[in-house]
């Protein structure tokens, strides 16, 4: 049995083929983004673009899938690329060591034409730039809000940005997007657990 056969049994051939040929861009491969990329690789997503300018720090070891004592100081995207290819050697993986900002976000989206974008950025301005560009360009995106300090997995929710509660990052994102004329249309994952 091929390792992708179980996904095909679950989703059917047509959906499995779509996953295998999909292009997903993940911005931020630390805590949330690292686990998202791992699951995309295990699902068989054929084309992954991973963007992050950070290196592994000792403080990442307790929560980031790629962080170990051995690789402190190493580029997160290079480590993640290696991990993806260990899972699926046939995957096309482009690791870009860069921050996303207003000046380069359009270039990344136009150049790679992702079917889907996962925003796992933890800095406000780059997060807003990516979200705004994707919404205005009709590129499917989901955005991760604040997870730090939360411990109750039953409080994790999926909702439009306009419906988020109890999350300081979501509130800030909502306010900044509103100034840009965006009040809804952004799927998010957030926690209702008070910090």
How would you name each of these model-derived features?
Residues 1-25:
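N-terminal charged helix/coil linker that caps or initiates catalytic domains
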Residues 103-114:
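Short amphipathic alpha-helix with an adjacent loop that forms part of the alpha/beta core around
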Residues 47-88:
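Glycine-rich phosphate-binding loop and adjoining beta1-alpha1-beta2 segment
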Residues 32-33:
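Hydrophobic/small residue at the entry helix of a nucleotide-binding pocket
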Residues 98-99:
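Conserved acidic residues
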Residues 26-28, 51:
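Conserved N-terminal Rossmann-fold NAD(P)-binding element of oxidoreductases
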Residues 116, 120-195:
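E1/E1-like adenylate-forming module used to activate ubiquitin-like modifiers
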Residues 93-95:
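Hydrophobic/aromatic anchor residues within beta-strands of the central parallel beta-sheet
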């Amino acid at each position: 049995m091929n390792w992708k056969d179980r996904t095909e049994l679950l989703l059917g051939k047509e959906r499995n083929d779509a996953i295998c040929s999909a292009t997903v861009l993940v911005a931020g491969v630390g805590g949330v983004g690292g686990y998202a990329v791992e699951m995309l690789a295990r699902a068989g997503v054929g084309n992954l673009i991973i963007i992050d300018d950070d290196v592994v720090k000792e403080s990442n070891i307790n929560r980031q899938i790629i962080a170990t004592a051995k690789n402190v100081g190493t580029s997160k995207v290079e480590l993640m690329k290696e991990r993806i290819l260990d899972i699926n050697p046939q995957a096309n993986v482009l690791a870009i060591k860069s921050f996303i900002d207003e000046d380069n976000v359009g270039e990344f989206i136009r150049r790679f034409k992702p079917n889907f974008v996962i925003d796992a950025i933890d800095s406000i301005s780059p997060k807003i730039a990516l979200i705004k560009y994707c919404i205005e360009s009709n590129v499917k995106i989901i955005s991760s809000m604040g997870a730090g300090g939360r411990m109750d997995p039953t409080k994790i929710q999926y909702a439009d940005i306009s419906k988020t509660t109890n999350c300081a990052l979501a509130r800030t994102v909502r306010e900044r997007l509103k100034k840009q004329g965006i009040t809804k249309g952004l799927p998010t994952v957030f926690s209702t657990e008070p910090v």
